[in-house]
């Protein structure tokens, strides 16, 4: 589902992704506050699908903001093999691992994944887990609640 919001003009490029972290104190008096913040869910990763040309003033972004259309971003994570079934809806939980230097750590503990998501596809790449866990790399899409 597409949503309308505002984003810094320098960041407003089709295809860019961002994780919405919530409003800042400086946003309180702004007349665009509702457009910027009311359509987005904190902690969700979004992808910009279109950018409008008009530029609007903003006290946070030096070069102003642009109106953009966004959708929840599809992205890749790693989960336990037994949970990796295409089309299934799951509630996210990180893989239990504390090896922060592991090449897979960021995919096992992804930022911007919260709540429920749908397994869009199971990727064919083999995941090598140093702890011996049976893992799969998958592509996911957040489920709108």
Curated annotation (Swiss-Prot):
InterPro entries: UPF0179
Pfam families: UPF0179 (PF03684)
Family annotation (PANTHER family): UPF0179 PROTEIN MJ1627
HAMAP family attached to this UniProt entry: UPF0179
Family per record: Belongs to the UPF0179 family.
Name of this chain's protein: UPF0179 protein MMP1679
Organism: Methanococcus maripaludis (strain DSM 14266 / JCM 13030 / NBRC 101832 / S2 / LL)
């Amino acid at each position: 589902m597409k949503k309308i919001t505002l984003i810094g003009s320098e960041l407003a490029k089709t295809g860019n992704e961002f994780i919405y972290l919530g409003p800042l104190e400086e946003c309180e008096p702004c007349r665009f506050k509702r457009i910027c913040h009311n359509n987005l869910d904190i902690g969700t990763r979004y992808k910009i699908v279109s950018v409008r040309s008009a530029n609007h003033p903003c006290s946070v972004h030096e070069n102003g903001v642009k109106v953009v259309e966004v959708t929840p971003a599809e992205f890749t994570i790693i989960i336990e093999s037994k949970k990796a079934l295409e089309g299934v809806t799951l509630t996210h939980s990180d893989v239990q691992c504390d090896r922060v230097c592991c090449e897979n750590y960021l995919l096992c503990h992804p930022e911007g994944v919260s709540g429920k998501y749908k397994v869009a596809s199971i990727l064919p790449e083999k995941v090598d887990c140093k702890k011996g866990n049976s893992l799969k790399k998958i592509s996911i899409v957040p489920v709108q609640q």
